[in-house]
């Protein structure tokens, strides 16, 4: 085992010495302390995970108190010593000669072929990572208590590709920011803010008009829900939403299609419907993704096919058009940078058309 040490969680101070002695004697693994249950520092959860930081009273005070407790219950010096013993990780880049030798047919041709495929993918992806828009693109980023789930890595990659992210609130702001070239509607808790979202009619109308006018948009999960005609809130009432996507969203009693998936763009005819290029691309490649939601839609889309690696289960999902990609799956852009690149290229086209 590569496990060099463990820390016990939610353990009582009375039990810790006995458990430490037992584990170290029987398993030969260092026990580096424990985290006791501190009632004043408990952070409650809800249907999609933790409460947001800004919703927690006295968060800084709780963290300071927890830090004080951990200074006494963790063996800090031993943890630092163990960390300093870790070897440096080295991943040398393959030279062209190495690539050829690795990929020559041999007794392990299957392994060689796999290495060649991975090298080809990395070479292709490196070209996408370095792409940058020749002009700065103003991209509206929905960011408030209703839309708060996003990966900072995704935002960093968009910035490195030339995006200026302009935050706005579909809950509180009456209008979209001026001179936008694209929209990002990520996940969050629209179901907890259904009434406020419905009452902000001007924002709903402006978002709908912008997308229908051709403004590129990426929408995930909560953002996808917001684009429907109506959405059921946690209070059981249905609220009017942006109306870009025909249909409604409702709450289910359990997590729906939960877990990791692989997305592949449907080609040609799907369910009797002719598929078109998505964000200007006929093939956006394969995208690892995940779904994490209690809600479902009567119009999930058919632009992509989702499959689960551990089973034969699969389903069609996501809406795709020349300027829109919207669905329940959450994407990680570094796993498939073709998607943010295609999105920003469409934003650049849109910017040029607005002159």
Describe the role of every protein-language-model region.
Residues 3, 134-135, 147-159, 164-166, ...:
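C-terminal and late-domain segments of enzyme folds
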Residues 134-201, 205-210:
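Phosphate-binding active sites in nucleotide-utilizing proteins
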Residues 7, 184-186, 328:
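Structural motif
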């Amino acid at each position: 085992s590569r496990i060099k040490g463990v820390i016990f969680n939610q353990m009582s101070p009375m039990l810790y010495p006995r458990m430490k002695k037992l584990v170290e004697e029987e398993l030969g693994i260092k026990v580096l302390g424990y985290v006791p249950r501190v009632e004043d520092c408990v952070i409650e959860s809800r249907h999609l995970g933790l409460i947001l930081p800004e919703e927690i009273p006295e968060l800084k005070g709780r963290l300071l108190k927890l830090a004080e407790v951990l200074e006494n219950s963790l063996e800090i010096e031993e943890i630092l010593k163990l960390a300093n013993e870790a070897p440096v990780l080295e991943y040398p880049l393959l030279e062209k000669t190495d690539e050829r030798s690795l990929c020559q047919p041999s007794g392990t041709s299957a392994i060689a072929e796999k290495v060649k495929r991975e090298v080809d993918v990395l070479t292709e992806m490196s070209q996408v990572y370095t792409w940058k828009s020749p002009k700065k693109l103003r991209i509206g980023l929905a960011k408030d208590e209703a839309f708060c789930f996003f990966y900072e890595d995704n935002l960093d990659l968009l910035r490195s590709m030339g995006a200026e992210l302009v935050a706005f609130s579909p809950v509180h702001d009456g209008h979209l920011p001026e001179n936008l070239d694209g929209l990002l509607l990520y996940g969050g808790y629209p179901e907890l803010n259904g009434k406020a979202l419905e009452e902000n009619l001007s924002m709903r109308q402006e978002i709908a008009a912008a997308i229908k006018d051709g403004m590129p948009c990426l929408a995930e999960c909560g953002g996808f829900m917001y684009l429907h005609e109506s959405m059921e809130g946690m209070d059981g009432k249905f609220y009017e939403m942006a109306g870009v996507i025909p249909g409604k969203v409702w709450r289910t009693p359990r997590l729906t299609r939960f877990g990791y998936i692989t997305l592949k763009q449907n080609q040609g005819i799907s369910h009797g419907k002719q598929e078109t290029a998505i964000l200007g691309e006929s093939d956006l490649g394969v995208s690892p993704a995940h779904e994490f939601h209690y809600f479902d839609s009567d119009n999930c889309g058919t632009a992509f096919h989702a499959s689960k690696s551990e089973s034969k289960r699969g389903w069609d999902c996501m809406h795709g058009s020349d300027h829109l990609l919207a669905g329940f799956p959450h994407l990680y852009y570094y796993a498939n940078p073709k998607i943010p690149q295609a999105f920003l290229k469409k934003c650049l086209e849109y910017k040029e058309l607005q002159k």
